[in-house]
A protein has these predicted regions:
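ASCE P-loop NTPase motor core, strongest for the SF2 helicase catalytic module
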Residues: 1-162
């Protein structure tokens, strides 16, 4: 459906073995694809092909190799095939499409199965995000720090009480 509508898709997985399974299926169906893992020799070439080709395609990326420093604005869909324990890594993956020059609305999907390990990881991610918001948010811990508190934190160990 997405291909027929002219959409390009990024598929992220933390497991290269899962990307291989998806790649084999897409190749069996003669679907255009690009592939990027830590073992990819021509990273720039794969990215350029995906960005410039007119034919809608799928870009399979490992979370670690494709999660940072890439600009993939020709995609309009992002699929996170399996969750990563650190929500920032997933956010970085989704952000590959949210760059200057993005002309499409971007839709991100996280694939989860009810009552699975992945669902529990997603719950832990949510708790981790809440903790960060509670500590660093507008009404969190850091907003109530005064100059004396900051001096204590930054200079701790310099005093004689040590």
């Amino acid at each position: 459906e997405l291909r027929a509508a002219g959409h390009k898709v990024l598929v992220f997985s933390q497991f290269v073995s899962m990307l291989e399974i998806i790649k084999n299926r897409l190749e069996a169906e003669n679907r255009p694809l690009n592939y990027l893992t830590g073992q990819t020799k021509d990273r720039r070439g794969e990215i350029e092909k995906f960005q410039t080709t007119k034919d809608p395609s799928v870009f399979l990326l490992s979370l670690k190799a494709g999660g940072a420093g890439l600009n993939l604005t020709s995609a309009s869909y992002v699929v996170l095939y399996d969750p990563w324990w650190n929500p920032a890594v997933e956010s970085q993956a989704i952000d590959r499409t949210h760059r200057i020059g993005q002309k499409n609305k971007v839709i991100a999907y996280r694939l989860l199965t009810k009552d699975s390990v992945e669902e529990k990881i997603r719950i832990l991610q949510h708790q981790k995000n809440q903790l960060v918001a509670n500590v660093l948010g507008d009404e969190g811990f850091t907003s109530s720090l005064g100059i004396d508190d900051l001096n204590f934190i930054l200079n701790h160990g310099d005093d004689e009480e040590g």
